Amino acid sequence: MSNITEKAAALLKEGTVKMIIGYEMGTERPRPFFCHTAEECEKLIMNAECKNNLAVYLTKKEIIGEDKIAVIGNYYVVKTIIQLYRENQINLDNLMVMTADENGEVISFDTIEAMKEYTDTHEPAPNPKVLAALEKIDKMSREERWTYWKNELSKCIRCYACRAACPLCYCNRCITEVNCPQWIEPWSAPLSNMEWQINRVMHMSGRCVGCGECAAACPLDLPIGL
């Protein structure tokens, strides 16, 4: 057993937590895994390919109840939990937060300060493709940027996969679902697409942790994570 599976199995056997949210190997890549028994812990993995932001589940009432749970996530999971705590969306008394280093050693966080220290000293290297895209956009004039985004966002089919994947999009009712009054048309159209994405970006300003889940979820590969 790895350090992760041993730690997870012990937590469930001792009754410290009722559920562990982590990663298991899927058909082609790691995927989220909800572990309820010590035996299931054998499936838990943690490596550089574990990219899903598991914090997205921590605000779901249908998943999170009164029982204490644990989450074993990557850097961005820890960073998101810090933000959710700041916004009073999670109760750390009912949550155990863990990650693992490059050697597979489990790192447990007892306080929000410990999480902050970890994220301050373990920030991943920037994605070269993202840096190249940002550099390209930075060189554009204001008019060129508007044309670029108008063309890109006109392809949006309004599936809202970006919203569903984002751990900081937790409103009970999104503005696109409000129809009295209707601020943004919910269907795909050039103007409403732009309104939706501008609204999404404004709501994420100063809050986004840079996990890239929105762009990863987009079926059209739109550069909405920039």
Question: Where are each of the predicted segments found?
Answer:
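Iron-sulfur-associated redox domains of electron-transfer enzymes in respiratory
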Residues: 1-155, 164-167, 172
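Ferredoxin-type iron-sulfur electron-transfer modules in oxidoreductases and energy-metabolism complexes
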Residues: 133-153, 171-226
